[in-house]
């Protein structure tokens, strides 16, 4: 390596380090509210099966997570939203809630879930929306961001990633 090449590499590394060392301006969530989702059980629950999206939308995969909760457990809204659906799908009781999250809707689904709400009803974060039916041994919790796009609902409980300056 020539001295000129070494100098160029050093200058590039120094410029990158200087850029990374600059503090980024903090950005609050719209309205200043907490954008994190709440666990549907009110607090973290043991996860039986984690989110494992398929390589293609038509393939099998886990489009949410299964939480280890007994029948009768109250289910709470993960965030403020509007109940999109509450009723049976393929003989399973389902609740789906549409949440606005920084301008983009996210639909949370809870299966099996005996509804204590109706479609079109506005709900607030932490409000009881249903219960895990008696005899059920888990709750499937999903999050959909589009017609065929899914995300891990457990990651939404963590909130946005925030970079902090080095001091």
Range-by-range predicted roles:
Residues 50, 98-100, 113, 144, ...:
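Generic beta-structure capping elements
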Residues 4, 29-43, 68, 115-124, ...:
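Acidic, glycine-rich catalytic/binding loops that coordinate metals and/or anionic ligands
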Residues 45-77:
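Short glycine/threonine/proline-enriched tight-turn/helix- or strand-capping micro-motif at secondary-structure
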Residues 74-84, 116-132:
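Short, well-structured beta-strand-loop connectors
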Residues 43, 73, 102-106, 147-150:
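Short acidic/polar mixed-charge low-complexity motifs
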Residues 78-114, 137-140:
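Zn2+-dependent peptidoglycan hydrolase active-site motif and core
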Residues 2-28:
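Secretory targeting and sorting signals
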Residues 66, 96, 109, 131, ...:
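Conserved beta-strand positions that form and line the central face of beta-propeller blades
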